[in-house]
Regions:
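Helix-to-loop junction immediately C-terminal to a conserved catalytic motif
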Residues: 65
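Catalytic Walker B motif of ABC-type/P-loop ATPase nucleotide-binding domains
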Residues: 169-172
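Conserved ABC ATPase "signature" region
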Residues: 115, 122-140, 192
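The feature captures the beta-strand-to-loop junction immediately N-terminal to the Walker
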Residues: 50-52
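Short coil-to-helix segment of the ABC ATPase nucleotide-binding domain corresponding to the Q-loop/switch region
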Residues: 104-111
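Conserved signature/switch motifs of ABC ATPase nucleotide-binding domains
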Residues: 143-146, 164
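Hydrophobic anchor residue at the start of the ABC signature
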Residues: 158
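Conserved ABC transporter NBD signature motif
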Residues: 73-83
């Protein structure tokens, strides 16, 4: 397979990556994390990144999110640099663990990005209620993270990522630490959210069944240095 395979179609792309490489300098020798990545993601796509551990899936997601800087190549997110897209709040990011602030209740955790974006108190309350309802957690506004199960906490993280209405969700193995039953249920909920909101989603996973169930496109990466070795379009009914 050519390493220049890309996620593309005739539609305009919301993420456009060309010949991107990333090398980490260490005290011993350079670590080549990504090599020759070419990828286009269209608006409304649900794209899963899969591949062996250490292949650069999370690193690629972090480059899109402006959390890592590429060594060479180009990347645009909604026609802007990743830095500009981050400042413009073009995406919400969901981490492997919920990353909720334990001293804030659930409602207040969802308010955090809204506070930073200058939303009024009334807007914050209305939006937190709207997105808690969307993820099935109405009535839990005043609870604290420690009072919720792991799956419920991750649903709060998704609500927080959606609260300021970004065009994209970037998700780094958000259900990887959960038991299989909870994970399957949250996958069904995430698929429903995607169908309802039509957000663009880039989703990192180790699970082939999860990728097939959720995605309309699957990007397969090689072992390090990470390259795109295949792009699979899934046409199964959801």
């Amino acid at each position: 397979m050519s390493e220049s395979l890309s996620v593309k179609s005739a539609e305009s792309s919301i993420i456009d990556i060309s010949n991107l490489c990333l090398t980490f300098e260490t005290q011993t020798e350079p670590v080549h994390a990504l090599s020759g990545i070419n990828m286009k993601v269209n608006s409304g796509d649900f794209v899963s990144l899969i591949g062996p551990s250490g292949c650069g899936k999370t690193t690629l997601l972090r480059v899109i999110a402006d959390l890592e800087k590429p060594t060479s190549g180009t990347i645009s997110v909604e026609g802007k640099s990743p830095h500009e897209a981050r400042l413009n709040r073009s995406y919400g990011y969901v981490f492997q663990t919920p990353a909720l602030l334990p001293w804030r209740n659930i409602e207040s955790n969802i308010h955090l990005p809204l506070e930073m974006s200058g939303y009024s108190k009334v807007e914050q309350k209305n939006l937190s209620q709207q997105y808690l309802s969307l993820v099935g957690l109405s009535g839990f506004e005043k609870k604290y993270p420690w009072q919720l199960s792991g799956g419920m906490q991750q649903r709060v993280s998704i609500a927080r990522a959606l609260s300021f209405d970004p065009d994209m969700l970037l998700m780094d193995e958000p259900f990887g630490a959960l038991d299989e039953i909870t994970r399957d249920r949250l996958n069904e909920e995430l698929l429903r959210l995607w169908e309802e909101t039509q957000k663009t989603v880039v989703f990192v996973t180790h699970s082939i069944p999860e990728a097939v169930f959720l995605s309309n496109k699957i990007v397969v990466m090689s072992a390090r240095p990470g390259k795109i070795i295949n792009v699979i379009e899934t046409n199964f009914p959801k």
